[in-house]
């Protein structure tokens, strides 16, 4: 599949999805819990990550109550797995300032295609695709489904600065974007956090809440990154790239901009928020991340 073909073909595919978003999803709350638990359980590529949470802090506090790093194990062996490697290849492709327009080389666009190809080779994404097809929420054609994923996650949109197309859902979620007041938005990838921790650019301040999902650990915390701050963000430590993409895609289809209650492999329920943005008539992922306190 070539990304160049996505531009023309996918307008129709995403248009059909947008039409669906105007009606109630066929996916029930019980089905969300079941399929998300299966996705967590089947995440065979997930990493075993050891955390040193240290001291608890409060939402809104930027006081540093944690002298050490949060990740104290070495996940580099996991980072060599195909989906992790494809994920890492994307991280340096983005302008992190919302005032600067993103531009991409053919090689960088090919890395986006390679990432979608890699995750679709996993049982997690294949299980998600099978489920969505069974509910009439996705095409059975794998190529069409890949194109759908590419558009909702990598399609570019403008929101923060008029006329500047500086964002995508994948960038916003997995990297971050710096606003004009030096605060940051997005930033939900534990993989990217680890990279910045190792480079000395991320200062762990302490945790607000934690949740054990069986295979991953959800943590909310304030962020101090490159001297820019965010008062509250969330990470799903240990999750593979395909699990996070699957959960975000599931909630984009089933509960866009609504409470999307999912289940960990141990049955722990929590919200997965997939916020959307509509740009030039097309609906995209804006951000995708876990939150606490499920609204059942």
Region annotations inferred by a language model:
Residues 20-264:
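N-terminal "domain-start" segment
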Residues 241-296:
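Compact beta-sheet-dominated globular domain cores
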Residues 1-3, 295-296:
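A positional/structural detector of protein chain ends, strongest at the extreme C-terminus
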Residues 2-19:
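Cleavable N-terminal signal peptides of Sec/SRP-targeted secreted and luminal proteins
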């Amino acid at each position: 599949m070539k990304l160049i073909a996505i531009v023309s073909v996918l307008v129709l595919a995403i248009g059909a999805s947008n039409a669906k978003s105007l009606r109630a999803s066929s996916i029930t709350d019980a089905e969300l819990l079941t399929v998300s638990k299966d996705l967590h359980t089947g995440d065979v590529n997930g990493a075993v990550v050891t955390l040193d949470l240290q001291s608890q802090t409060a939402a809104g506090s930027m006081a540093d109550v944690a002298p050490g790093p949060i990740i104290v194990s070495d996940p580099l062996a996991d980072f060599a797995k195909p989906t992790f490697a494809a994920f890492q290849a994307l991280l340096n492709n983005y302008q992190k300032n919302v005032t600067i327009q993103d531009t991409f080389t053919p090689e960088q666009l090919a890395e986006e295609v390679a990432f979608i190809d890699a995750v679709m080779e996993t049982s997690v994404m294949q299980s998600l695709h099978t489920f969505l097809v069974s509910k009439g929420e996705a095409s059975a054609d794998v190529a069409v489904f890949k194109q759908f994923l590419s558009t909702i996650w990598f399609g570019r949109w403008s929101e923060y600065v008029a006329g500047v197309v500086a964002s995508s859902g994948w960038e916003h979620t997995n990297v971050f974007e710096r606003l004009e007041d030096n605060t940051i938005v997005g930033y939900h990838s534990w993989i990217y956090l680890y990279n910045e921790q190792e480079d000395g650019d991320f200062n762990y301040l302490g945790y607000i809440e934690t949740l054990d999902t069986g295979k991953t650990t959800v943590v909310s915390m304030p962020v101090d990154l490159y001297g820019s701050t965010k008062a509250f963000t969330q990470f799903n430590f240990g999750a593979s790239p395909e699990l996070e993409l699957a959960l975000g895609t599931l909630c984009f289809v089933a509960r866009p901009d609504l409470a999307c209650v999912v289940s960990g492999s141990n049955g722990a329920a929590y919200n997965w928020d997939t916020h959307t943005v509509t740009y030039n008539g097309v609906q995209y992922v804006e951000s995708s991340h876990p939150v606490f306190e499920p609204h059942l």
